[in-house]
Each structure stands twice: as structure tokens, then as C-alpha cells.
Amino acid sequence: MKPNLQDYPKFYRWLTLPFSRKPHRVQVLQRTNRILTFVMPGIYGLVFCWLFFKKTSMGGIWPFIWIPASGFVLFSLFRHWVNVPRPYEKWEIQPLLEKNSSGHSFPSRHVFSATIISMCVCQLSLPFGMCSMLLSLLLALVRVLGGVHYPKDVLVAWGLGLAWGGLFWLV
């Protein structure tokens, strides 16, 4: 089936069909979302532990603070300004993830944050960074399957996280 976003409820039903047939998968999806939203900030904390144990100077630590922080602030301001409704607000769908907020769907801040954290890790260790990047992609998938973001929300957020993380190579 080719996705037709003009009929998002039909696309979402198709996307979540494996979950409607096996309800325990919904619990796995919800737990995965919860775990990843805790793991990614934990990974960011481990970045600073790594920098501390490597006795990195403040000048070396500073980019790991200002690049993610400035990106997060600018990203949040843009997101607030465009204020796109979430899929469950616009369409008659029942999301698999609980979300009580409205608007601010585009782009996904969870995915942007996870991606920029992964870019931090890439600066320290490419193999660990790639593992972290896979977690950010998994989070993107979970957010779409969960019905709290459109595919474009997470793809744009992931791309912006990669682009903003490119600042590491400029400093």
C-alpha cells in the first residue's frame, strides 16, 4: 500500500495493523517510548562523564553544552511559532501512545534532542555514536507508530538534528 497522507486515518490504520492484532505489542511500544525518553538524556549525561574522566578542558566541553542547548532553544521557538496540530487532533485516530498536549507536532523535539545527543556521542566515539543514532531512529519510529507525530515531523527533526550537530565539525 502506498501511503496517502490525504487519508491519514487509513494510512495510520495500515501502519498500526500489527498492533491491533497483537495488543501486547502496544505495551512494548509504550515501554520502548518511555525507556528511550529516559535513556537518551542519560546518554547525554554519560557524555559529560566521559569528558570529565578524559580531563577535557572547559574549552573542549563547551561545544557539548552550547551546540545542543542553542539548537534546542531555536528548535523549540520554531516549533512554537509553526504550532502544527498532532495527528490525533486533526484526524479521527486513536493514538497508541498517551499524549494530552495539543499542537507543537512539527518537528518532533524528542527526535531532534535524541539526534543531537547522538551527534555529541559521535564526537567521542563513532561506534557508540552510531548505536545512539539507531536509538534516535527507533524513537522516531515509535513516535509515528504511537500516533503522536507524522512521519515528516520525525524526518525533519532527525535531519535538523544532524545538520545542527554538524556544528561540531566547525568548532
What does each model-found stretch correspond to?
Residues 1-44, 59, 75-101:
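N-terminal transmembrane-helix/juxtamembrane module of multi-pass inner/ER membrane proteins
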Residues 24, 49-56, 124, 171:
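Structural signal for the C-terminal ends of transmembrane alpha-helices
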Residues 27, 31, 57-61, 65, ...:
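Hydrophobic, aromatic-rich alpha-helical transmembrane segments
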Residues 45-74:
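Interfacial segments of alpha-helical transmembrane regions
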Residues 48, 70, 74, 78, ...:
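Alpha-helical membrane-inserting segments
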Residues 53-56, 83-88, 147-152:
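Transmembrane helix-loop junctions in multipass membrane proteins, especially transporters and channels
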Residues 65-79, 130-142:
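Small-polar-interrupted transmembrane alpha-helices in polytopic inner-membrane proteins
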Residues 92-171:
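Membrane-embedded catalytic cores of phosphoryl/pyrophosphoryl-handling enzymes
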